[in-house]
Design a protein with these regions (language model features):
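Short, hydrophobic-biased segments on the C-terminal half of alpha helices
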Residues: 279-283, 488-489
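Short acidic, hydrophobic short linear motifs in intrinsically disordered regions
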Residues: 242-245, 254-267, 294-302, 460-472
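Basic, low-complexity terminal or inter-domain segments flanking catalytic cores
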Residues: 2-8, 19, 28, 100, ...
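Metal- or metallocofactor-binding catalytic centers and their adjacent structured scaffolds
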Residues: 219-256, 444
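C-terminal or mid-to-C-terminal helical accessory/interaction module adjacent to the motor/catalytic core
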Residues: 116, 120-198, 248
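Intrinsically disordered, low-complexity regulatory segments
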Residues: 1-143, 152, 213-214, 229, ...
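Conserved short loop/turn motifs at secondary-structure junctions
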Residues: 5, 85-86, 162-166, 247-256, ...
Length: 747
């Protein structure tokens, strides 16, 4: 008797497949497509513009074996469940699978999971639906728009500026935002102002500080030293009396749960994670992690969302958890409901834990350090959003002298509320004096100890960080949750923008490309136009606009601009000026310039070929040298290999021996320093490079938590291996000394 046919479930990734198969049982076979199996060709435009923008999709070559296997499995399957991610991209992948596998509407059923838990997975399988063609059309419209812009504009940039450049509908706008901010900073006219703090003492000899506020209850700013001296002279011999004392309570509410943009912002601020890394770790938490006693568990809901909605089940679970673990007074008293901004897609919930009982402490031992830190952030933010307000006793004291008012503020926590679990990070800290105030009464005389004038100058707007750029893009409607991280990765990898510490700074190349785009393709880099395109894509998704009508409308003006630009720039070659550095050539003393090479940016002498001296750009890493406590710098060898070294170089007391017997002076290692310290010895923890899930480890040989090199995630090279490799190259590669993490690296 032939065996009964199984149902086939297709998801994107093996991790997701593993988690879901555990929930569905033996009647279902769950396999991974590994992403898109059909796409536009890489070598041609792939769009028949004359035939009403008909796309020419082809199978992805690298996935031929997967396609063949899926065809075989689907042919013998009872029903094929297309269970790709619950967004436009996932819907399009499902549609491509249906077309590629030649599935009928009856056999191809669409299921989505906002969270990968047994209840949600089984409920979804029991309630399948048809593929949403509006979602598919919205994704196709975005894909074809991006292909038209990139494929038509990039060759122009290659011919006129430099090979390898690219332009994009969202990336070019993001670059412009960084360039515009830099221009704001350059054109900013700084103005002088002064702060004036009065160091005061009460009758009970308690000292406190009050800052100049104004005169006769009217707020004033001190614009010059003369104005400051006027106040100082007027109050020098005048009495200081407490004018008013205002006491009250201040309530602070928790932040809403995370959406994609706020998760990326907070992970950048609090954890130092790039948006791309944040989304990669979040994907792991969503798809499933092995938790002892629970099996494979999807720990968070879907991470690409701009909705603040929370399910009633999640809200009730939060209520019960807070009351059980913190007490009734820590619960808000009712469900907090947060309003999603207009224009957001409300198909998904906010990002939250799937099971609040799986607290960070419960799952910590089963997670990598990055997974744990990000999960703790998500869990804490969600839990806090349903907790009671934090309550502060607030005191504002105004002290009068000769009609001038000095103000002192102080807040003291009365009830922790949600802050017992979570507090949001800040981009900027306040510089207001916050010294504790003595008990003061109105009319009480206080005594001036001294005046502390301080000259200040107004500051230009700060450069964007990755977090603040994402926030600005979200506020201006540029891109969608799925595009923030790849956009920032693109503009940095193409070196339109570089990181200066935590800030994003445009390069000369980025400014030249932006200038060309503004002059020749103003719509492409116009923020309002780009936002309008996003709104039209939303209309396609809701069925209000036909997707090809959007393409027709866009391409008419775009093709005209393209023709005009090619004519105007015929025979023109645009030179990108060298970017001067603060370093000087060790050989000839000239001011070095920044160049781009195969392995990224480096410093070069401008006198080349007369002088060919080069050196790497120094990038400071988190953590400290385990031997002397100095900074650790990221370095790149001439062959493009990245290593990490103590800033003191040979002056660092660390010593090691290379495979060739030579002495290594100064700490250096292939392992990546992290922000975390060893809980036993306090030294910086390191981890292997790459995207693996290996946990960070201690490299301090005197520490009980020391991890030998052969247990650090990848195989240690032998001296023989290193010498064999040396023969193939003109330069010796760093090699390891036994029981050390350092390897010799030649600059």
């Amino acid at each position: 008797m032939p065996s009964a046919k199984k149902n086939l479930v297709i998801v994107e990734s093996p991790a997701k497949a593993k988690t879901i198969e555990k929930y569905l049982g033996t009647d279902y076979k769950v396999v991974a497509s590994m992403g898109h199996l059909r796409d536009l060709p890489k070598s041609t435009l792939g769009i028949d513009i004359e035939n009403d923008f008909e796309p020419k999709y082809i199978p992805v070559k690298d996935h031929k074996e997967i396609i063949d296997e899926l065809k075989k499995l689907s042919k013998n399957a009872k029903t094929v469940y297309l269970a790709t991610d619950p967004d436009r991209e996932g819907e399009a992948i499902s549609w491509h699978l249906k077309e590629l596998l030649a599935l009928s509407d009856e056999r191809a059923r669409r299921v989505t999971f906002n969270e990968i838990t047994k209840k949600v997975v089984t409920d979804s399988i029991n309630k399948p639906r048809d593929i949403d063609n509006n979602l598919v059309d919205a994704q196709q419209a975005r894909r074809l728009l991006d292909r038209l812009v990139g494929y038509k504009l990039s060759p122009l940039l290659w011919k006129k500026i430099r090979r390898g450049l690219s332009a994009g509908r969202v990336q070019s706008v993001a670059t412009r935002m960084v360039v515009d901010r830099e221009n704001e900073i350059r054109s900013f006219n700084s103005e002088e102002y002064w702060l004036l703090d009065a160091m005061l003492e009460s009758e009970g000899s308690a000292k406190f500080t009050a800052r100049f506020y104004g005169k006769d209850d009217k707020k004033l700013e001190l614009k010059s030293e003369d104005e400051v001296n006027t106040v100082i002279n007027a109050t020098k011999d005048a009495p200081f009396k407490v004018k008013t004392v205002k006491r009250g309570k201040k309530h602070r509410s928790p932040s809403p749960p995370f959406i994609t943009s706020t998760l990326q912002q907070e992970a950048s601020r609090r954890l130092g994670m790039t948006p791309r890394r944040t989304m990669s770790i979040a994907q792991q938490l969503y798809e499933g992690v092995d938790i002892k006693g629970y099996g494979t568990v999807g720990l968070i809901t879907y991470m690409r969302t701009d909705s603040l909605r929370l399910s009633d089940e999640a809200l009730m679970a939060a209520k019960n958890y807070i009351i059980d673990h913190y007490g009734q007074e820590y619960y808000h008293g009712s469900f907090r409901v947060f309003k999603t901004k207009s224009g957001a897609q409300d198909a998904h919930e906010a990002i939250r834990p799937t099971n609040i009982e799986l607290s960070p402490d419960v799952v910590r031992k089963d997670l990598t350090n990055e997974q744990y830190r990000l999960y703790r952030l998500i869990w804490g933010r969600f839990t806090a959003c349903q907790m009671a307000n934090a309550v502060y006793d607030n005191v504002v004291v105004d002290v009068d002298s000769a009609g001038y008012v000095f103000r002192a503020n102080y807040s003291e926590m009365r009830f922790a509320g949600y802050t017992a679990v979570y507090e949001e990070g800040k981009d900027e800290e306040s510089d207001e004096p916050r010294s504790k105030l003595p008990s003061l009464e109105e009319g009480e005389q206080v005594f001036l100890e001294k005046m502390l004038p301080e000259q200040q100058f107004t500051q230009p707007p700060a450069r964007y960080t990755e977090a603040t750029l994402i926030r600005a893009m979200e506020e201006k409607g540029i891109g969608r949750p799925s595009t923030y991280a790849p956009t920032i990765s693109t503009i940095t990898s193409h070196e339109y923008v570089v990181k200066d510490g935590k800030y994003l700074k445009p390069t000369n190349l980025g400014e030249i490309v932006t200038q060309l785009m503004e002059e020749r393709f103003p719509d492409i880099v116009d923020l309002k136009f780009t936002n309008h395109m996003e709104e039209e894509l939303d209309e396609v998704e809701s069925g209000k606009l036909y997707w090809k009508e959007l393409l027709r409308s866009f391409y008419g003006d775009f093709s005209t601009e393209l023709e005009e630009a090619e004519k105007a720039l015929d025979g023109v070659r645009i030179k990108v000026p060298d970017e001067l550095s603060d370093e000087y050539c060790d050989v000839c003393g000239r001011q070095m310039v920044v160049k781009s090479g195969r392995f990224g940016r480096f410093l070069a002498c401008p006198a080349y070929p007369e002088c060919s001296f080069t050196k790497p750009i120094v990038i400071e890493m988190p953590g400290k040298c385990p031997k002397c406590g100095s900074r650790i710098l990221k370095r790149t060898s001439k062959k493009g290999n990245t290593y990490y070294a103590c800033e003191r170089g040979a002056d660092c007391p660390w010593r090691g021996t290379a495979a060739d017997g030579s002495e290594i002076k100064g700490f250096m290692t292939w392992y990546v320093p992290t922000k975390d310290n060893c809980p036993s010895c306090g030294k910086t923890l390191f981890k292997p490079s790459g995207r693996g899930r290996q946990k960070a480890f201690c490299i301090n040989e005197d520490c009980p938590e020391f991890v030998p090199e052969d247990k650090r995630g990848y195989k240690k090279k032998s001296a023989a291996d290193s010498k064999a490799e040396d023969k193939k190259t003109a330069e010796k590669k760093p090699a390891a000394k036994k029981k050390t993490t350092a390897k010799k690296a030649k600059d």
